[in-house]
Design a protein with these regions (language model features):
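Short-chain dehydrogenase/reductase
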Residues: 122
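Conserved "HGTGT" condensation-loop signature of ketosynthase/thiolase-family condensing enzymes
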Residues: 1-107, 112, 116-119, 127-131, ...
Length: 234
């Protein structure tokens, strides 16, 4: 029997908007943003035990760190490379660094498959909980704007980080699988957005969760699709 899955809390962080320097300069910027945002959503959800499965999604990953590492290697040779930069160049570094910071012993996943990484990561966490593989999950979606990321994307990349706490206990927003969309009535078409851009997707979901303060105990519904997401009150 499939479990119902709810988003209990969400949080966001942007170094550019908040103008707060990171305390640990040994970590890459994506790892720093993940740690800051998970800290915030843990406080918002009043999570005492942070040892929960972690799902990190990013379209481009730590491209700035990888580019810096490879640039020195190609231009000056392997002996000139700073070995301390290598951990930051690994794709799953943000998930591992966040796990170490919060002493997470549960599985940690990194999804990086292009512009749909945001919706794919949230959907993967949903499926794990819905099928009773895990009881709750922390989903962290992050992007870094860098020179190499701009070249790949063809434009500037929206930078920031969002975290969502998912579990089976009833919360503000319930996640529904794709097939359920066709059964919904009076879907708010004005709220439909393309889910291709990670930060645009995260911003919409974060606002959807944060703005919902019902007095009658009702919840909202988040329906995941490949092309868009549908939002409605249920």
């Amino acid at each position: 029997m499939k479990q119902r899955v709810y988003i209990q809390a969400s949080a966001s962080y942007s170094e550019i908007q908040e103008k707060r320097p990171f305390s640990n300069r040994d970590l890459d910027r994506i790892s720093q943003m993940c740690i800051q945002t998970v800290e915030r959503v843990s406080a918002a959800a009043q999570i005492q035990d942070r040892n929960v499965p972690l799902f990190v999604g990013t379209a481009y990953g730590c491209l700035a760190s990888l580019y810096e590492f490879n640039h020195v290697y190609e231009s000056e040779g392997a002996l000139r490379v700073n070995p301390s930069l290598f951990p930051n160049a690994v794709l799953n570094a943000p998930a591992c660094r966040t796990g170490i910071s919060f002493q997470i012993q549960e599985p940690m996943y990194t999804i990086s498959n292009g512009r749909s990484s945001g919706i794919d990561t949230l959907e993967l966490a949903y499926l794990y909980i819905a099928h009773n593989e895990i009881r709750e999950a922390m989903v962290c979606l992050v992007e870094e704007d860098s020179q190499i990321a701009r070249k790949i994307a063809g434009h500037s990349v929206s930078e920031g980080c969002f975290a969502f706490h998912l579990q089976t206990e009833k919360g503000k927003v319930e996640i529904k699988e794709t097939s359920y969309v066709f059964e919904l009535q009076e879907i708010q078409r004005d709220s439909d957005q393309q889910a291709a851009d990670t930060m645009a997707f995260c911003t919409l979901v974060h606002e959807f969760v944060s703005d919902w303060e019902p007095k009658d105990g009702s919840s909202r519904c988040l329906c995941l699709e490949r092309k868009r997401i549908a939002l409605e009150r249920v």
